[in-house]
């Protein structure tokens, strides 16, 4: 029998023994040299391996630091009873022949809210909005803008259903024409011509020589006046 000693080899490799065996127990772990061996019992953790955890999520430095591609969309499951499991962001199929197939879909079980953290006059650095070339909004009830202003940067309206801009409305109602110049305002204007109307109603009786008298202040032509006996 061969005499085994430190440095003995077999097949050209050093024989492992208690002094050079690379596996060592460390509590419930097993180390290879100084490195932990993962097992079914001791599984790798997200913090140990630059993972984003399914259970714990990941934000800031623990979140994704580079672009992430999702081939079939991002599904956001409802966390309440009655919500749809189709919530999420999904890509279209690239078929430009039909809008519903080509568009990217932002899906919601009921509605989509756009929220920001602006304060004061709303001119902070947090902005929200839809900014493609065309925004088509369909609603069966109403479209509510709960903000100080709704701003349109486009030109003036061209159709009856178009939303108008303030400068367009101001220009339309403040335009001075020959007809507008011939009208009398509600107060403060003096006419230079005759005023003809079927009847004039005066709330107050005449009290100055230049006032037009009311019917109860005059004597009707050809009427009989009874002044009584003196």
Curated annotation (Swiss-Prot):
GO terms for biological process: symbiont entry into host cell; virion attachment to host cell. The keyword Cell inner membrane does not apply. Its main location: virion. One of its GO terms (cellular component) is virus tail, fiber. Pfam families: Phage_T4_gp36 (PF03903). Keywords: Host-virus interaction, Viral attachment to host cell, Viral tail fiber protein, Viral tail protein, Virion, Virus entry into host cell. It is found in: Virion. The keyword Electron transport does not apply. InterPro entries: Tail_fibre_p36. Disulfide bonds: none annotated. It comes from the Viruses. Structural component of the distal-half tail fiber. The distal half-fiber contains two molecules each of Gp36 and Gp37 and one molecule of Gp35. This is Tail fiber protein p36. It comes from Enterobacteria phage K3.
